[in-house]
Structures are given as C-alpha cells and as structure tokens.
Amino acid sequence: MGMSGSSGLVHVLMLLLLLSILFHHTESTLPSDSEQLSITGRRMMANYKPNTAVETPPSRSRRGGGGQNTGAD
C-alpha cells in the first residue's frame, strides 16, 4: 500500500486547505469579545431578581447534631 510522493503531498495540501477554511469560517462566525461580554451580561441580568428571598431547596438530611456531644462522659 505505497503512496507516491506527489500524491501524499496533494493529500497534505488538501487537508491544510480544508483546515484553514474551517478555522477561518468558525472565527468569523464567533462574536467579538465585547459582544460576548454583552451577551453574557444580559443572560446574568435575566436571572437576577431584585428584592426576593434566596431560594433554597428543603433539607433532605436528618436532624443535625447541633454540636452536642452524644457520648457518655
């Protein structure tokens, strides 16, 4: 299964060309840093609820020890 030198070179060049096109395409579709920060800020503020209690789920644990020593002296 031998590969001639020029055929191998063509395959390598095609691979590099595809990778460069893919990299350039994904880079151009990503938002810039300032846009990304703006989007992140909007998402965080959408979850912000002023003047509301902190939501905590009910405890699933049994009765806590409360720091009391249960062993005999």
From Swiss-Prot:
Induction: Accumulates upon infection by generalist herbivores such as Spodoptera littoralis.
Keyword Cell membrane: yes
Tissue expression summary: Mostly expressed in leaves and flowers, and, to a lower extent, in seedlings shoots.
Comp. bias intervals (Gly residues): 64-73
Motif window: SxS motif essential for MIK2 binding: 59-61
Leader sequence residues: 1-28
Origin superkingdom: Eukaryota
Chain intervals for the UniProt region annotation (Disordered): 48-73
Motif (SCOOP motif): 53-67
Protein family (similarity comment): Belongs to the serine rich endogenous peptide (SCOOP) phytocytokine family.
Record note on quaternary structure: Interacts with MIK2 (via extracellular leucine-rich repeat domain); this interaction triggers the formation of complex between MIK2 and the BAK1/SERK3 and SERK4 coreceptors, and subsequent BAK1 activation by phosphorylation.
Protein name: Serine rich endogenous peptide 1
Organism: Arabidopsis thaliana (Mouse-ear cress)
